[in-house]
Amino acid sequence: MRKMLATVLSQVFSGMVQKPALRGLLSSLKFSNDATCDIKKCDLYLLEQGPPTSTVLTREEALKYYRNMQVIRRMELKADQLYKQKFIRGFCHLCDGQEACNVGLEAGINPTDHIITSYRAHGLCYTRGLSVKSILAELTGRKGGCAKGKGGSMHMYAKNFYGGNGIVGAQVPLGAGVALACKYLKNGQICLALYGDGAANQGQVFEAYNMSALWKLPCVFICENNRYGMGTAIERSAASTDYHKKGFVIPGLRVNGMDILSVREATKFAADHCRSGKGPIVMELQTYRYHGHSMSDPGISYRTREEVQNVRSKSDPIMLLRERMISNNLSSVEELKEIDADVKKEVEEAAQFATTDPEPPLEDLANYLYHQNPPFEVRGAHKWLKFKSVS
């Protein structure tokens, strides 16, 4: 009788597990709801106190972060494949290896806050809300792209995301301008202005520092230090590699950019600093890119394969999060494999769309050049007025 009862219960639970909703319920029962995780202390500059050295990670957050990081990783690898198949032309800068920066920054701010970055922008496009389909379609120059196929890799845009910028460092003063607008409007919003270690020596970056400090703008200057500006190591291009100290009178912090929780907590700290009216702050994210500078760079002429593999094996951001989730009973190997399979399917479907969606027609070439403002009050007062009908 007891054996028969056990068999019946086993069959009942087996049937329940076949149903996704019940399977998710049963899975959640065996996992912890949250875990307290230690994170590396940040190096501080002109700050008496920094971000916390421990934080709570919920199961829901962990699963979300893991999935988003996997999407970015697979999306970039698919972009590499499409480029080699000549579906993508021109410039293409990939961010695989830097997923913790992309996802961690978004986790530390509000959706209404603003982000502006350089040309390595695909990951931030995704975390700002764009779909994989629209990003890959933009890379292949299709109508369904986020910029209607006209921007390509370096010029993608989303709500409160002012895209990739092709000129090295040019986005930094623009970010200060966005922060000035936030202060002027008194809306409590901030701007994250991202740039790489290669752009950190640009004069316009220091000009933006100065004006932001002078006017106490709510701007977080973020240097993504991936150790190489194109093919030049940071030690060969900068007299000082303490990028978090380059703001002179602006406080700064150096963050482990391979750990999503370190990035998240540092971003929250920096955002609170700006929102409280203390002015700008500089964040240096120590990270690494697995690909070369761009698709035309194999990435092994100025660094060894062993160096890249060493970072992959010891500091990979997805691996670190996966290990943290499993060791804290926030997930299981089997559950994460299911997420991986789901992500792979999503990216494959997006790639199919990006290679079959039609290209924008020639008659769209002159569209979206001018904003259709109301007519000028004085007829004929502006010599360029007749060209506004081109769009």
UniProtKB/Swiss-Prot annotation:
Q: What is its EC number?
A: 1.2.4.1
Instruction: Name its GO BP terms in alphabetical order.
Output: glucose metabolic process; pyruvate decarboxylation to acetyl-CoA; pyruvate metabolic process; tricarboxylic acid cycle
Q: Which GO terms describe its cellular component?
A: mitochondrial matrix; nucleolus; pyruvate dehydrogenase complex
InterPro entries linked? DH_E1, PDH_E1_Alpha_Subunit, Pyrv_DH_E1_asu_subgrp-y, THDP-binding
Class in the EC hierarchy, top level: oxidoreductase
Q: Which UniProt keywords apply?
A: Carbohydrate metabolism, Glucose metabolism, Magnesium, Metal-binding, Mitochondrion, Oxidoreductase, Phosphoprotein, Pyruvate, Thiamine pyrophosphate, Transit peptide, Tricarboxylic acid cycle
The transmembrane segments are: none
Q: Where is pyruvate bound in this sequence?
A: 93, 119-120, 158, 166, 168, 197-199, 226, 228
Which cofactors? thiamine diphosphate; Mg(2+)
Example GO molecular function: pyruvate dehydrogenase (NAD+) activity
- Mitochondrion keyword on record: yes
Which Pfam family, any one, appears in the UniProt record?
A: E1_dh
Localization terms from the record: Mitochondrion matrix
Tell me which tissues or organs this protein is expressed in: Testis.
Gene3D superfamilies tied to this protein: 3.40.50.970
Q: CDD domains, from UniProt?
A: TPP_E1_PDC_ADC_BCADC
The UniProt annotation places thiamine diphosphate binding at 119-120, 166, 168, 197-199, 226, 293
Residue sites binding Mg(2+) per the record: 197, 226, 228
Give the protein's biological function.
The pyruvate dehydrogenase complex catalyzes the overall conversion of pyruvate to acetyl-CoA and CO(2), and thereby links the glycolytic pathway to the tricarboxylic cycle.
Q: What's the protein called, per UniProt?
A: Pyruvate dehydrogenase E1 component subunit alpha, testis-specific form, mitochondrial
Recorded source organism is Rattus norvegicus
